[in-house]
């Protein structure tokens, strides 16, 4: 039976892989079980790790540190890469508001930490450790321990406080989301609603009655007009055609125009009259039945050399006589303007004759199978850049110790930046949704298994000490009170959708486990987008605050 002992107990690379895989498998298996209608999902991996550590399982400390760090990096980088394309646009759609609400969660928790330390007599280093556990923020704990070492103060006690408060930190945010959902959220609030966005693409029909544009080309009219638009079809004398930019408009021409909804009124003035007898934005319109000579087909951009190119530079309309009416990217419908920068995976709705569309298909690629091949080069380059960013020390006035973004902050910021701007420098950042979810789940499982295993050895001894229950109660308060209060204000008073509120609360508490629960129980991507919108700022602030509290109150 020596082989069995070596497999599970003798420290080695093989033993570390076996133990962490076993913990992850048990935790993920339990995560499928629903208790009172609620499943904690991947969070059970953390508790399986605590039990394994309590019963004596351990792995080599260096292997544990590597697996924990690598798992966290994979998770946050993949998350940033996924939400990157919509990250900066989210600031125009409430991102600033979400960050202000997340900031309120951070500051309220910090205030409660100071008050609780003075009210209960718990030392500030212990209280900072409890705060780090309550906010599931191990980078902040590392920063706090480093600060204590530089101040010549014992640095091990915050780790115990963090370990004791951490489980409640994981569950507390989920409980806060559950409480808000139970008492405030109605069934219709969980339905995916189309956002009221004036910039979304809109299809409208116009008839040319403005003498100012009679006998002028579409190109000249577009230069006269500030609102951007695309003329998809032109009806003249009973004949339907796809107009090129040189097409001259005449009185009485009927136009099918794609633009932003906010521009409809201005274009009505430009063309002369809007036809409102047909709703062209309904999803059940048979576009191919509108004109028998033309067909509509969706083509996917799969040729790598097109990544980062402007749509207008391809001159598809002039060369092939087709029209691109809409572009879909990551579930978002974009206006097909000449300035639009193409990304691998974009889905273009092309209208034209069958032969012309076949030619366009060759230009764009439309080889969907090629998109399933993972672009691992970008993954590893991004991880290196993210870790480099996280290692850069930032000097802040009044604080002697430089502050770093760390393992979590650097990679998610680089992931967001590459997801947003990568195609502009012809870097292929496209990853299928299933591949991205696999990376995130793998990274999070590794991270939680290591975290639980590390905390499990002394967890129950600390919990059952006289001050253990007090620490648990304080940690629960630091987790639940700020999230419930801010969540109530965000959802009930500010009328922010429940998915975004949940993601904001998870991001403000740096809690990927709660985010996983939110993603599993709330339709749509709003939780992930909101999480990534507030996570970088909150992570940075948590790391700074952990150091500032100790320096100013103990210095």
Curated annotation (Swiss-Prot):
Any one annotated GO CC term: plasma membrane
Keyword annotations from UniProtKB, A to Z: Cell membrane, Membrane, Repeat, Transmembrane, Transmembrane helix, Transport
UniProt subcellular location: Cell membrane
Transmembrane segments: 13-30, 35-57, 72-91, 98-120, 157-179, 376-398, 408-430, 437-459, 469-491, 498-517, 532-554
InterPro entries: AAE_transporter, RCK_C, RCK_C_sf, YidE_YbjL
Stretches assigned to the RCK C-terminal domain: 188-273, 282-366
Classification via PROSITE patterns: RCK_C
Molecular-function GO term, any one: monoatomic cation transmembrane transporter activity
Family: Belongs to the AAE transporter (TC 2.A.81) family.
Name of this protein: Uncharacterized transporter BT_1229
Higher taxonomy: Bacteria, Pseudomonadati, Bacteroidota, Bacteroidia, Bacteroidales
